[in-house]
């Protein structure tokens, strides 16, 4: 008995091994385009195991490659007879008709197949996927569309949206999106995500806007289309239109200006300062009793500051008006947690735009003592205070401020900025070895700007030291930069004018031209500054400041000239 069992097992193993070998060989023939050899093996294998979907599909594909229409049809019909519920096989039969250019026959067959299989949700899904498997996207869409007619739009909206998207059928997708959110508002987030992808960067979004407006008019009681219209305006970056829309929604829903405030903040992020200002002023206009009154005042101040200082030529009158606005805010609310951000802006204005460094120092020293402020905000105040001290010539206190931030935020961008400022201060003082040692650390800083600045300053030191034993030329140049930082134009210009005569063979020529351009720009002599920047990138195109000079020249040309 054992012998018979062993023989049977051995025979079974041999048969399986032979079949496995034949499968591999058939697949290899098929991949190599040797279809006739593959066909013989697949025919044999399929007879042995007609339930194998893998063998069936490979055999069918081989017959199609050999243009064996009758055999292909017989094979599929056999599969349908053995597995009548398997819709993949039924789609395959129509696919065979198409493959052999029997289009009318295929169309009649597919129309009948779809008509008979759209009553159940799972049936629709399987049939549509069967069409997609054979790259028959239009038929998959037809299946979903017929399913929608039978079972409602919500049953297949996700699949149909995806099919329209994959076939670039933007108009039908948009119309479907309207129907879906009208039928079920809970689909809004999903549908808007799809629309954002389809209408990326506002491309061809006029149709979307038109349809949204139409549905909003047809369904005035359904606020969801007003919400969608707001999304459309934002996607198109039409912030003025978005503000009008959000004002309407805010009023309708008694949001107390909250949504307008949020949109104004978004406008600031996108540098749409005029629209942001209008939004903040609207919320302020609601009155002091509204909860968003103070935040909107702070937002307005921040927007006005960013708008005013964005230009390389800030308007002095606008600076003065903004200073007055901030002072009024602080007078009404005091120096506290709520007004600290606006006071920080006031300090920046006084230090950098109003030639009143002392006032800026007093403000910052007051902010730092204010309770409940976040440590990161206090650190930002200390960095600005360090700059202000430095402008006053108070080097020791500047180092102290930078050092405190560096120590507290060692691995953070704030700490790296503080370390860079301290390295720059050492550079101003002529301590190039120490400055370069700190800059080398910062070359791998997480913040790209700090890393780039560190690399640039380190290269400046490296390229212009070691040429003489005293490094006097570089020290004088660094001192000139320091004087410019302090707005001491006379001292800076005096050094720059003498440097080429004192050190005629030095490599600082491009740096001198560049710093002279910065002096002229700071004085408002933009034409002269532009000439000097142009000289830098034309004469010294290979040097480290050429890109900076080109950038400054472009900014002056765009904003002033």
Show where each model-derived region lies.
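Acidic, polar-rich low-complexity tracts and alpha-helical solenoid repeat scaffolds
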Residues: 18-561
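Sec-dependent N-terminal signal peptides
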Residues: 6-8, 56
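N-terminal signal peptide c-region/cleavage motif recognized by signal peptidases
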Residues: 13-15
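Short non-domain terminal segments
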Residues: 9-10, 418
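Positively charged n-region of N-terminal signal peptides that target proteins for export
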Residues: 1-4
